[in-house]
Amino acid sequence: MARRVESTHAWIEQLAYQYQCGESDSKSLGGAIALMKVHATKNFEFCAREASQILGGSSYVREGKGQMIERLYREVRVSAIGGGSEEVLMDMAVRQAKL
């Protein structure tokens, strides 16, 4: 899980730097941001699922030590859909890619 989180964080930092320095035009940066969102939400879903697996039954209870995992696992799909579904974002990224 740490590898996935660190790779997502590094990608976000790289895109923020490119935006701040004006290194990329808005179209290519938009496509890269769309790909990064898909990557981040897939990693979020994976980490929520694995954390739920680690905690077992406690991750399904809204109280106690598993309450945070329960909430994240319940809301993971909402965060993936908000701002554009993965399919729409992937299509946009491909259309805006510089090939």
Could you describe each region identified by the protein language model?
Residues 1-99:
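Alpha-helical interface subdomain recognition
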